[in-house]
Amino acid sequence: MNKVLLTPAKCALDMGDGSERGLYVNQDYILQKMKKVHRGISLMYTYYPNDKEWPTRACQIDTGRESTGAWDSPYENYFPYRGGREGLRDGEPFNFMKDIRRHGMDVVLTLTIDPHLKEEDIILLAKDLRPYGRLLLRVNHECTGDWFCYTKRASYQEIADFFVMVCRVMHKYAPNVKMILCAGMWQKSTGKLEMEDIFLEAHKAADIWSGDNYLSLHWGWPNDHVSKETANYARYSVAEVYEKAKMTLKRLRKITGQDKPMVLSELNADGDVAGPYVQSNMMKQFMDLLQKDKENWLSAFTFYQFRDDGRLGMEITDPNNSEIGIEQPIMNMYKKQLHKAFFSQKIIKAEGGSELPVTLRWGGSEDAEGIEVPVKFNRTPVLFELTFNDKLLPLNMMIEFNGWWFYKAPGTKCIDLMSYFYEKSNAIKKPGIFKLRYFLPPADGMNKPKTGDPYEAKDGDWLYNYYAELPELPEIRIEESPVCRRITHLK
């Protein structure tokens, strides 16, 4: 038995889960589909508390006229963020944030915000986010465009200055939050970033640099169809998009004199444009380029998204029942890529004792302590499960076995791991020792100080780390042949 440490992948993968184009899908379902955790799950919300229509969702506001586009509304058509002034911390997005963290992943939160809000409003948002560990926050993304509603309310300089103010507030009141600036990207025609002078100070203030770039996109959805008679869509060269993203980072390093992580916060191809098979092939080409590139320049990208009302998802929403998804060809391709070493967190031996009981630290999906146990198999088993006694029953646990991940919720007594062997490629070909690892993310999805209100408590280690004790190991039950061989004949 050893103590191990979960560390970053060469390129992390995040998953978009819910936006204006689709509902949130719970993490149990996604884990069952993917058989592996992501680094983070991306949520998208909007916040315009000064508007008279607030908090009505934009698509439900009666404007007295027919909508002409996806963003033809008073504010963006994401679900409303109900924290902040309202202080509703038990509903969206907080219930989903807790679900994400319980399942061993970090929260990646996008907020489009009224750029005329004051510092005191942002302080309220910062306090909302303090209990959620190492959280990534993207504010007013694609800010050099003209489609989002906030760009119609302020100048680009005002938008840039607003982002700098939000960074300053978050760093002071929620230091666990890292700020993502998703702004203009490199342009081949100029050799510069779009609006790089206006957003220079914002780039310097951000913790993480980002861009959004689709390999193909039908931006006319849902108001028109891709056809020879319409023009609201495009398909791009995968190689050119790759170069654009990479050159964006190089240009940012040059103009800021800084070096920060680079991510792509929205990436996919749109099945509406050239069909689902081309969608899958284009994304595979991009992911192959990343793995062949020795510079390892991209820290992470977010696949947008898991289930989509259009054709931007691994699943498309069943039009008869929004709780059901229809799997697309891209899911199988992406799942194979997700399990590759390049996109997987590394699990390495950690310092410190592993004697039981042991206290394990959960910092996040790229920094967490676990316990590793060797398991011997002579052949493919017919039964492989873990059982949890009364001491272990309350624990919230993520379990890793040979690259596959399983979740144990508080109160669950037994976890069946046999599904790993249902994949023909995972059959035991010769006797060997396999590694089983246990990690303990927060049971309620939140970090809390030993005493006091997490929204108001003093800064400390609790902002970044959650600790839980593993008193003993689960019982491992393995059967390599059927227990019952005798046939009982009916009388």
Regions found by a protein language model. Give the residues of each.
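Glycoside hydrolase catalytic-domain groove-lining segments
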Residues: 66-67, 74-81, 214-273
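Aromatic-lined carbohydrate-recognition surfaces of secreted/lumenal glycan-active proteins
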Residues: 168-194, 257-272, 298-308
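Aromatic- and acid-rich polysaccharide-binding/catalytic face
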Residues: 41-52, 196-239, 304-309
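Alpha-helical scaffolding within the catalytic cores
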Residues: 25-33, 84-96, 120-127, 188-201, ...
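Substrate-binding cleft of secreted/luminal carbohydrate-active enzymes
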Residues: 2-27, 33, 47-48, 260-355, ...
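Aromatic-rich peripheral "rim/lid" segments of glycoside hydrolase catalytic domains that contact
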Residues: 293-297, 302-412, 445-491
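N-terminal carbohydrate-binding/catalytic regions of secreted carbohydrate-active enzymes
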Residues: 16-129, 293-295, 306-309
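Active-site groove signature of glycoside hydrolases
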Residues: 126-156, 179-186, 264
